[in-house]
Each structure stands twice: as structure tokens, then as C-alpha cells.
Regions:
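Transmembrane beta-strands of outer-membrane beta-barrel pores
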Residues: 1, 6-8, 24-28, 49-57, ...
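Gram-negative/organellar outer-membrane beta-barrel architecture
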Residues: 1-135, 212-216, 228, 292, ...
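A short alpha/beta connector and helix-capping loop motif
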Residues: 272-287
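C-terminal outer-membrane beta-barrel translocator/porin domains of Gram-negative envelope proteins
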Residues: 30-31, 60-62, 73-77, 89-90, ...
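Short, glycine/charged-rich beta-strand-loop motifs at protein surfaces that mediate ligand recognition
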Residues: 266-272
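Small/polar glycine-rich anion-binding or flexible loop at a beta-alpha turn
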Residues: 254-261, 274-278
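Outer-membrane beta-barrel channels and translocator barrels
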Residues: 9-11, 38-42, 96-98, 148, ...
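Membrane-embedded beta-strand positions of outer-membrane beta-barrel proteins
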Residues: 20-24, 45-49, 101-105, 160-162, ...
Length: 314
């Protein structure tokens, strides 16, 4: 995708007066992000909006921890085309140096497209409301703390979210939810580090749609491979900094990493003791001391997956 950023540096900067970011992704569609910081930089208003592209889809393998992978079918069999419009404002405030509190709202529209010969038809009938336009409102709050408790411990970041969503057409279909995560980065030497993230989600009612369910992010499986009412997963990487590549254009660092993931979901009425795992590794490149690209290959009981990522930091 491509992005355009416009930043205004007025009299009051924290570090800027405001910023607009507009982008387009081939699969996800159009996206907008606006940042409006307070003059002292301790409070910020965010406005996020998106309109999906006609190619946007979400995987659906059914509910539960033991769903089949349908390896004999083509990938499209488990794909559901989704038309979405989203508007998500949020207000962020610094409580202390290490603590941030965010209050957010959401107004979302979802419509799953009817497509013949797809798995979703075996779960939902042709006239099911999932194939009509559904509007949702939501409210919530997130507390995040980044701190090093003791000098001998790594820097820890933990985040806790509590929220609620409701279907505007059917107000009785609403549910509260909670999420929690913990991440850390242990540096054994200048070149060798261990990074890890643990994350869990709990839905406190059964009135949610498949695209709102709790899921796990294991790199050897397709997205939303397992969904349910509760979820937990952890992924970890061992990273080796191989040094710098000399070139006349930009500073370029590179390295190797190996990773291992595990997790599972829980769904009412299902008895499962399985924990899913994936493993693999890859290479990373950092340029301008800011942007990192990752090329990875992860395997699981389903298959192997190649992934390319571009982002800030590692």
C-alpha cells in the first residue's frame, strides 16, 4: 500500500500541531489517521477511519479449537468477503511517565458477501443476517504501562483493555469483553536478544459475530484459523544482530531470528485439550535506523507460511 502524511508545525508543537495520514492498501482499502496533540504533549486526540476495498476478506474455519484446516480445498473456500466502514475516535492521556490511559469509541459497519461454494454456507444459511448490513457501536478503555520494575529485569510493557460492543439493528446482541497483553525484550548482549508477547481475550457473552470472536495469532497458521469465546497465545523470538551493510545510500542493519508460538481458543460446548504451535525463522533488515522489513517462514500442523512485514522498530 501507499501512504501520504501531512504534518502541521504551528506555534504549539507536541511535537507537532496536528497530523493527517491517508493511505490505501490493495486488500484493506482506504485508511485515515488524524493525530491532534495537546500543547503540552500529555493528551492526544486520535481519529481513525477506514473503507475496505472490494478485495477485503476474512478467513472463517468455524468456531472452536479443533476446527479442520480443509487442506484439500483451495484457500478461497474459507475466505469471506467483507465490506466494512469504520470510524474509531480515541482520547489518550499520560497519567505518569510510564502510564497511559486511552478512552475509545467505535462505529463500524460490516456486510459479509454471499459467495457460492464457500465454507461459510455450511454454518450460516443463505438468508442469515450475517449477509446483511450490520452496524455496531462500541466503547472502551485501555491502560498501558511501560516500566522496568528492577534493574535486573527487562523493560516490560503491559496493556489492559475493557470494552463493550452492540449491534444497532439488534440491541439485544451485545457483549462486554476484556483483553490483556504482556511483552518484554531481554538483551543478553549487544547482538543477542529475546523478545516475547503474551496476549489473551475474553468475551463475556455469546452475542458476537465470527469477525468479532477471540482469536490467536500464530505465524504458522492462516489468520483467524481458530476463533472462540476466549483465547490465549504467546510468540517469542531469539534475534541475532549480524552487523551493518556498508552502502552509499542509507545505514542498513541486518540479522537473523528464530521463533516459536503457541496458543489456543475456548468455545462453549467443546472439550479440547490441544495447544497449537508454530515454529520458524527468517531475516530482518533495518534502514534509516527506523524502518524494519522482516522475511519469515513458519510451519505448523497445517502447512508452512511465508510472510513479509514492514514496520517501525523490530
Amino acid at each position: 500500500g501507499t501512504f501520504f502524511t501531512y504534518t502541521m508545525y504551528g506555534f504549539k508543537r507536541a511535537p507537532f500541531t496536528y497530523q493527517h495520514r491517508i493511505g490505501y492498501n490493495y486488500l484493506k482499502g482506504f485508511m485515515y489517521a488524524g493525530i491532534f496533540p495537546n500543547y503540552d504533549g500529555r493528551r492526544r486526540l486520535y481519529l481513525n477511519a477506514s473503507i475496505s476495498s472490494p478485495r477485503n476478506f476474512e478467513n472463517f474455519f468455524g468456531f472452536g479449537n479443533n476446527t479442520a484446516g480443509y487442506k484439500e480445498e483451495k484457500k478461497n473456500y474459507n475466505r469471506v468477503k467483507l465490506r466494512t466502514y469504520m470510524f474509531n475516535p480515541s482520547f489518550e492521556m499520560d497519567l505518569r511517565k510510564e502510564e497511559v490511559m486511552t478512552f475509545f469509541g467505535s462505529l463500524d459497519m460490516y456486510k459479509a458477501k454471499r459467495t457460492d461454494d464457500r465454507y461459510i454456507y455450511t454454518v450460516y444459511g443463505e438468508d442469515h443476517p450475517i449477509f446483511r448490513t450490520n452496524y455496531f457501536v462500541g466503547l472502551g478503555a485501555t491502560y498501558r504501562i511501560t516500566k522496568q520494575p528492577y534493574s535486573w529485569l527487562p523493560l516490560l510493557e503491559t496493556e489492559w483493555t475493557a470494552g463493550w460492543k452492540m449491534n444497532l439493528k439488534k440491541p439485544e446482541r451485545n457483549f462486554p469483553y476484556a483483553q490483556g497483553s504482556l511483552s518484554w525484550n531481554v538483551r543478553f548482549s549487544d547482538r543477542f536478544t529475546w523478545a516475547s508477547l503474551m496476549k489473551g481475550t475474553v468475551l463475556f457473552d455469546n452475542d458476537y459475530e465470527f469477525y468479532q470472536a477471540a482469536t490467536i495469532d500464530l505465524r504458522g497458521f492462516r489468520e483467524n484459523r481458530f476463533i472462540g469465546k476466549q483465547s490465549f497465545y504467546q510468540y517469542s523470538d531469539l534475534r541475532l544482530d549480524m552487523g551493518k551493510l556498508k552502502n552509499p545510500f542509507t545505514p542498513l542493519k541486518y540479522g537473523l531470528f528464530a521463533g516459536f508460538d503457541y496458543g489456543r481458543v475456548w468455545f462453549p460446548g467443546e472439550r479440547s485439550h490441544s495447544w497449537h504451535t508454530s515454529y520458524g525463522g527468517g531475516i530482518w533488515l533495518t534502514f534509516l535506523n527506523k524502518f524494519t522489513t522482516k522475511y519469515s517462514w513458519f510451519g505448523s500442523t497445517d502447512s508452512f507460511r511465508f510472510a513479509f512485514e514492514l514496520g517501525l522498530g523490530f
